[in-house]
Regions:
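Residue-level signature of catalytic and energy-coupling elements of molecular machines
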Residues: 4, 133, 155, 193, ...
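Acidic/histidine-rich catalytic cores and adjacent linkers
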Residues: 5-9, 14, 88, 246-380
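RNase H-like nuclease fold core
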Residues: 10, 17, 24-27, 35-36, ...
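Short, amphipathic alpha-helical "recognition" segments used to contact nucleic acids or chromatin
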Residues: 71-85
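The alpha-helix within a helix-turn-helix
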Residues: 92
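Inter-helix linker motif
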Residues: 209-229
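Conserved phosphate-handling catalytic cores of large alpha/beta enzymes
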Residues: 224-248
Length: 380
């Protein structure tokens, strides 16, 4: 909107200091609708009137208004083209503009989308479960992303945090940011978190939500297990893992786990010891005794990994990242917003009431940001 302001000031003088004897005057504003490649958008159009030689005033057509409409449309086309893999120079040739204008359009629109992504109020989300995962846009650049599932089965991408690795400090900074934005998780009930085997994520969760139910992703468990077994034993291990994924409740889960552990113990001692040490994380969800129709949703981190896969299609095009700018944040903001456009409710969402009931605690817990910060200080 600065373009409009600059042109009006040029014609009429600065606000509250009109040009003496000038032919132009301000005539207020009016809401107008402009059309872009994404649809329509309302802006406040400045109006200017000019005194003619016959003593009558006429509306002045502002050049900046047409330029804003052109730029709005161009920014959206630049965004779409770059996200679909086009180069900056190629987009410039397609739109008939210079490479610098393409760069300007991309930066402007991606900053708007990042502000939109991080400007949302998280306090209205009734969080039932959360998933956390990291994506590596560069060799020394990691972005940790948090996704929430509410009590109605809707998925919400919450925020992300940049770092050099998926460390506990990076994950804690992300959780602190979510708290500061109003995320009210783990208060009305315990929080269910499905995660990979990362010790960093587990540590951060214990600080912010000490009684959270931490479920290890069984896809990661299976992957690690098969890596330790010989090829001829992998098929049977996968079959027993599939049984564990399918059964319902604590008792059936315990039986399926013991069957798997017995099989692995006879094939690889190190794999069996590792599996047994992770038993509580592997069976955490089964011990809630909820319908097995929810297993496919909460026994793996597939929901957030699908988001990460889509995000890599966007950020994977960048060969060199500039840590001194907001480049990583802008690209990730765009990638995550685009990934969220295709979200649907999770499978088994009609059974989430039973999960919410299973996560209830007898009394409220003090899980505020202040108490979490105090715990972090003690650990340090």
């Amino acid at each position: 909107m600065q373009l409009l302001t600059d042109e009006v000031n040029l014609l009429c003088g600065a606000s509250y200091r009109p040009q003496e004897g000038g032919l132009y005057r301000r005539a207020g504003t009016e809401p107008v609708r402009i059309r872009t490649s994404e649809g329509t958008e309302f802006i406040d159009k400045r109006r200017v009137r000019k005194m003619g030689q016959d003593g009558r005033e006429q509306e002045v057509r502002l050049n900046s208004y047409a330029e804003i409409k052109r730029r709005k449309g161009m920014f959206e086309e630049v965004l779409e083209s770059i996200c679909h893999g086009a180069s900056g120079s190629g987009v410039g040739k397609m739109l008939g503009v210079s490479a610098s204008q393409v760069c300007e359009g991309w930066k402007a629109r991606s900053r708007e989308l990042l502000a939109e992504f991080r400007g949302r109020d998280l306090s209205e989300i009734d969080v039932l479960a959360m998933m956390v995962d990291g994506v590596f846009p560069g060799k020394e650049r990691c972005v940790v992303v948090a996704l929430a599932i509410d009590t109605e089965g809707h998925k919400h991408l919450l925020d992300f945090e940049e770092g050099s690795s998926e460390s506990a400090e990076v994950v804690m900074a992300l959780f602190a940011k979510l708290k500061a934005r109003g995320l009210d998780a783990g208060v009305a009930r315990r929080l269910l978190v499905t995660r990979d085997g990362s010790d960093a994520i587990a540590k951060a969760l214990r600080h912010f939500w000490p009684d959270a139910v931490q479920q290890e992703c069984l896809v990661h468990v299976e992957r690690g297990l098969c890596a330790k077994l010989s090829y001829k034993h992998q098929a049977e291990a996968v079959e027993k893992m599939n049984r564990l994924r399918a059964v319902e409740g604590a008792e059936a889960g315990e039986e399926a786990f013991e069957d798997l552990l017995k099989f692995v113990s006879g094939k690889n001692l190190a794999a069996a010891e590792s599996l047994d040490a992770r038993k509580d994380g592997i069976l955490a969800f089964h011990r809630l005794n909820v319908p097995a129709t929810l297993n496919v949703t909460f026994l793996s981190t597939n929901h957030i990994e699908n988001v990460m896969r889509n995000a890599r299609q966007v950020v994977g095009r960048v060969s060199r990242w500039n840590d001194k700018t907001d480049q990583v944040a802008r690209w990730m903001g765009v990638a995550l917003l685009r990934a969220q456009e295709g979200f649907r409710r999770v499978r088994g969402h009609k059974e989430l009431g039973s999960l919410a009931a299973a996560l209830e605690r007898e009394g409220p817990a003090d899980l505020s940001l202040h108490s979490a910060a105090a715990e972090m200080g003690k650990a340090a």
